[in-house]
């Protein structure tokens, strides 16, 4: 049954770029459309999206519709089948494009590649966290109903939502789906806008109909129910176009795999606001005999009025012509193979003239003569906003960037700025064309046009500004640097040269200052033992929250290729999304940079295996290269199966381990604490999320390094018990019981960015407080105590209040 839509005539509204292609955000732009009554998102909800929305002080709860632009394909990367290209492309053109694609693929795998090519994960990789945050802040309506939210996009959105059921919920959000296919893409109309999807498709050759890969399992995981998945659409019966997404029979309603040759969709949009009614001509109405106010009202509402003399006055006689609404196009054309399909689509011809056109394109597409000719065909008064997939060196999270720059003054090695982070190019090319940046606006209405007044400035000048405005901080920094430089180098010990990089140090959801959980462990190895002498590390990720890949890219720049190629193990402590929602992005990068022969170990709860298997049915994952081991296989109170033992043996050999144990954490089901011990003598223990645990203290005994969550300050002990987390003092007490010498506290509550009230100057226990991007060797943790005064000054509440607009000068 159709519902009545009451149109709102709104002349003034604007769109704003939340993110563009960068090291830590999706290569598909995220565009926020603002009306008084509600907000919309077009483009992507990629990793880092909700943090960028928060950083720009936009209201997540006001967003009611998201329109995605990129479809999925289960084929391997870069295997486009040119036979599905436009019929107007000649055979020679196809061959040339195929060759060009080969060059592009080669460039993608080069160390200095700066161009991203969209995948399904780029489109919606941040949606799990987005949905959880939206659910937390949404409130029921007046009659108790859940807050409405519609996700528009390719039909595989259904499968994607179903695969997320192991770790997402939305009891406060009535989530519905509007799926598009190449044959059917209905127009969306609400009180503010009319949205027409423009869908084109391209077939990828899927390894020439590759078979569905199997993950190398080290568990007794229950297989997916293929019979139910393939015989009918019952697997998504709990996701429909007119009902909320409800989890039912979670272990069995599994996504049906996409057909091997299912076309990949590229969706553009025509967006138009509703026309403004013409003005009521009171003088003309009076001349026609209309004298009563009620009659004027009826005419204004479009109703005819019959006078006492029998004459009928019609609205068109007293109301001027309506003013057409404003229109804009969002073009998604990330591949040269679909240029003709996009630009020759009949819907552009039939659409109203746009005020502006947004181009989500690769550099190759933008420079293509055919595409340039199409841009030139628009009237000269039309503005063009170019959102290239080329990596932009922009600041997406200003307060975090300011904190990192300030910490960098204290110690540039422990708190590196990151590679190429802070270059900001000119936004506007000319009056007609502008390159999109975060916070760039385009206004419609009285002040139609580009507004770049809010676009952030370069942060390179920030260090001098900080030192000038915070003279006390400068003196604290100089004092700390003197202590560190005067201290003799600590003697080496087993594991002293292991490097720890705390990529994400906050809890629950991203914040202005901290991203969610991820700790990167870089273990040096003997180059002589390696086939590739350039790779001198074997790396581990301890948890992998949303945005982990982005932080790695910021941290290591063009060396990201080597870091990812050296990644051998991902450990997931439990199934909360803030600890694992970044794994798919890392796997995508690992596929791109690994040699194709390497194995990647993943130890995680069994539900995580289901997530990977089901997600791989809608998007490519390198499952044949993954060795999965359930965390429960390592429990001290049980013996692993023969298959688990075989997988564990390979893991032990890879890292030269003599011990790897887990114990149940005092947190959610299937959550674990762990320790690993190397044959050389070093030992690392990691708590994950937990209340203080005697069992963990026991397996962490005499560890070289203990990494422990410290979510809440000591005054919030009751909340810590309720939420099953640890306070600062409780975490340190576990470290003391374990007899460890070095401890890193992390996973701080996002409620407050201030520094924990902890004495870090102790000699017997070396304490480091984790910050995003902090990098230090285990042997350097003992120097962290000299940073106490400058850190306390930097993160006191008064200084934080002063940073209301940290990038403004």
UniProtKB/Swiss-Prot annotation:
GO biological process, one term: tRNA 3'-end processing
Coiled coil spans: none
GO molecular function, one term: 3'-tRNA processing endoribonuclease activity
Chief subcellular location: nucleus
Ranges for region Disordered: 74-93
Subcellular location: Nucleus; Cytoplasm
EC numbers for this chain: 3.1.26.11
InterPro entries: RibonucZ/Hydroxyglut_hydro (IPR036866), RNZ2-like (IPR047151), tRNase_Z_dom (IPR027794)
Family: Belongs to the RNase Z family.
Described purpose of this protein according to its UniProt entry: Zinc phosphodiesterase, which displays some tRNA 3'-processing endonuclease activity. May be involved in tRNA maturation, by removing a 3'-trailer from precursor tRNA.
Designated name of the protein: Ribonuclease Z 1
Organism ancestry: Eukaryota, Fungi, Dikarya, Ascomycota, Taphrinomycotina
């Amino acid at each position: 049954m159709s519902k009545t839509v009451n149109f709102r005539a709104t002349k003034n509204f604007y769109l704003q770029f939340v993110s563009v292609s960068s090291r830590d955000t999706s290569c598909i732009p995220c565009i926020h459309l603002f009306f008084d009554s509600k907000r919309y998102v077009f483009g992507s909800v990629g990793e880092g999206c909700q943090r960028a929305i928060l950083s720009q002080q936009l209201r997540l709860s006001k967003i009611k519709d998201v329109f995605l632009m990129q479809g999925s394909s289960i084929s391997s990367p870069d295997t486009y089948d040119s036979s599905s290209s436009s019929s107007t492309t000649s055979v020679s053109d196809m061959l040339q494009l195929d060759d060009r694609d080969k060059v592009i693929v080669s460039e993608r795998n080069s160390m200095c590649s700066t161009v991203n090519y969209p995948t399904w994960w780029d489109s919606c990789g941040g949606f799990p966290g987005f949905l959880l945050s939206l659910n937390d802040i949404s409130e029921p309506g007046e009659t108790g109903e859940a807050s409405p939210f519609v996700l528009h996009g390719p039909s595989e959105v259904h499968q994607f939502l179903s695969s997320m059921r192991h770790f997402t919920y939305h009891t406060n959000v009535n989530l519905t789906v509007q799926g598009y296919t190449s044959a059917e893409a209905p127009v969306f109309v609400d009180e503010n806008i009319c949205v027409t999807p423009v869908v084109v498709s391209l077939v990828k050759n899927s390894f020439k109909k590759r078979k569905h890969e199997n993950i190398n399992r080290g568990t007794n995981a229950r297989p997916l129910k293929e019979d139910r998945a393939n015989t009918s659409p019952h697997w998504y019966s709990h996701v429909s176009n007119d009902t909320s997404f409800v989890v039912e029979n979670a272990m069995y309603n599994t996504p049906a795999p996409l057909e091997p040759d299912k076309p990949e969709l590229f969706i553009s949009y025509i967006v138009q606001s509703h026309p403004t009614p013409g003005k009521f001509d009171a003088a003309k109405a009076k001349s026609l005999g209309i004298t009563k106010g009620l009659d004027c009202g009826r005419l204004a509402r479009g109703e005819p009025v019959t006078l006492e003399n029998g004459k009928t006055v019609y609205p068109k006689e007293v109301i001027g012509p309506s003013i057409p609404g404003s229109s804009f196009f969002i073009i998604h054309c990330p591949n040269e193979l679909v240029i003709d399909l996009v630009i020759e689509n009949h819907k552009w011809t039939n659409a109203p003239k746009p005020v502006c056109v947004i181009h989500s394109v690769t550099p190759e597409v933008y420079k293509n003569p055919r595409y340039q000719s199409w841009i030139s065909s628009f009237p000269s008064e039309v503005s063009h906003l170019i959102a290239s997939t080329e990596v932009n060196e922009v600041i997406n999270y200003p307060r975090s960037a300011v904190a990192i720059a300030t910490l960098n003054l204290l110690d540039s090695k422990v708190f590196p700025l990151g590679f190429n982070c802070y270059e900001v190019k000119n936004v506007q090319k000319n009056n007609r064309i502008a390159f999109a940046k975060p916070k760039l606006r385009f206004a419609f209405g009285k002040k139609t046009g580009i507004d770049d007044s809010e676009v952030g400035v370069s942060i390179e000048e920030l260090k001098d500004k900080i030192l000038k405005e915070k003279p006390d901080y400068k003196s604290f920094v100089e004092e700390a640097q003197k202590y560190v430089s005067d201290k003799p180098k600590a003697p080496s010990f087993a594991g002293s040269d292991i490097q720890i990089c705390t990529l994400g140090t906050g809890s629950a959801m991203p914040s202005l200052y901290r991203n969610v959980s991820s700790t990167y462990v870089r273990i040096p190895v003997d180059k002589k033992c390696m086939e590739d002498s350039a790779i001198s590390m074997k790396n581990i990720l301890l948890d992998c929250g949303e945005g982990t890949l982005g932080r790695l890219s910021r941290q290591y720049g063009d060396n990201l290729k080597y870091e990812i190629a050296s990644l051998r193990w991902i450990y997931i402590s439990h199934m909360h999304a803030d600890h694992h929602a970044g794994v798919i992005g890392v796997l995508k990068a690992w596929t791109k940079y690994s040699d194709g022969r390497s194995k990647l170990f993943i130890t995680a709860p069994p539900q995580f295996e289901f997530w990977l298997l089901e997600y791989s049915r809608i998007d490519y994952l390198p499952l044949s290269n993954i060795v999965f081991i359930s965390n429960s296989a390592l429990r001290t109170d049980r013996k692993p199966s023969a298959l688990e033992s075989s997988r564990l043996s390979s893991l032990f050999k890879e890292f030269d381990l003599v011990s790897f144990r887990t114990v149940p954490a005092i947190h959610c089901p299937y959550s674990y604490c762990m320790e690993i011990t190397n044959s050389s003598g070093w030992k690392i223990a990691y708590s994950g999320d937990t209340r203080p645990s005697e069992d963990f203290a026991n397996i962490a005994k005499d560890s070289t390094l203990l990494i422990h969550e410290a979510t809440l300050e000591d005054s919030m002990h009751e909340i810590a018990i309720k939420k099953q987390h640890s306070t600062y003092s409780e975490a340190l007490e576990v470290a003391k019981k374990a007899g460890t010498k070095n401890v890193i506290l992390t996973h701080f509550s996002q409620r407050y960015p201030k520094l924990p009230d902890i004495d870090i100057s102790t000699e017997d226990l070396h304490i480091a407080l984790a910050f995003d991007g902090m990098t230090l060797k285990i042997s350097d943790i003992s120097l962290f105590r000299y940073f106490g005064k400058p850190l306390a000054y930097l993160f006191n509440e008064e200084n934080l209040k002063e940073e209301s607009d940290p990038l403004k000068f």
